[in-house]
Amino acid sequence: MSQTKMLKVRVTLFCILAGIVLAMTAVVTDHWAVLSPHMEHHNTTCEAAHFGLWRICTKRIPMDDSKTCGPITLPGEKNCSYFRHFNPGESSEIFEFTTQKEYSISAAAIAIFSLGFIILGSLCVLLSLGKKRDYLLRPASMFYAFAGLCILVSVEVMRQSVKRMIDSEDTVWIEYYYSWSFACACAAFILLFLGGLALLLFSLPRMPRNPWESCMDAEPEH
């Protein structure tokens, strides 16, 4: 591999590394969406919530003269509950809606697949750098691109999850906005998917410019 192409590969891997960090941050944090309830003038507190792939947290925030509940960063009584995705027979005290839990389980499972693709891609990159096996960059690029697509699907599932929660009559929340964990997931998709495609492009062997070039460059037979 030429020096110019190697430089492009290193820059691409750096972008992919940033995407990996953002993907990990999005998966382990619970600020994908912030939910706000309908405001009642006679209430002294309001209950806002934020949630991610693994748990939902509600916070009772003292009300002031504003017409909105929050922001979520204000001090208040906080209560978090894990979704308990893979423990049948157990249910969350807060997350009582079967359909909503199915959305969350799907998003979490897809995110785990994404992390698996990231691990496989990273192993291929490490093996290629260790013994100059440049051909391993090609499967690595595909793994990273698949990881990005999984993140995108997880983002869409969570988006539908939030919409379903807001539209449900069983919840008190009527307003929402996507928070920084959601932004990390979107940025991770862009970096992983485009980085994977760029890595595949840079790792492909150079095509001959002329039909006879490959024959002229071939080693003579003995």
Curated annotation (Swiss-Prot):
The keyword Zinc appears for this protein: no
Gene Ontology biological-process annotations: calcium ion transmembrane transport; establishment of localization in cell; positive regulation of muscle contraction; regulation of calcium ion transmembrane transport via high voltage-gated calcium channel; sarcoplasmic reticulum calcium ion transport
Matching InterPro entries: PMP22/EMP/MP20/Claudin, VDCC_g1su, VDCC_gsu
GO molecular function, one term: voltage-gated calcium channel activity
Positions of disulphide bridges: 57-80
Topological domain ranges for the Cytoplasmic compartment: 1-10, 130-134, 205-222
Localisation: Cell membrane, Sarcolemma
Post-translational modifications: N-glycosylated.
Extracellular side: 30-108, 156-179
Listed GO CC annotations: L-type voltage-gated calcium channel complex; plasma membrane; sarcolemma; T-tubule
Tissue distribution of the protein: Skeletal muscle.
Source domain of life: Eukaryota
Annotated glycan sites: 43, 79
Transmembrane segments: 11-29, 109-129, 135-155, 180-204
SUBUNIT field: Component of a calcium channel complex consisting of a pore-forming alpha subunit (CACNA1S) and the ancillary subunits CACNB1 or CACNB2, CACNG1 and CACNA2D1. The channel complex contains alpha, beta, gamma and delta subunits in a 1:1:1:1 ratio, i.e. it contains either CACNB1 or CACNB2.
Protein name (Swiss-Prot/TrEMBL): Voltage-dependent calcium channel gamma-1 subunit
Species this protein is from: Homo sapiens
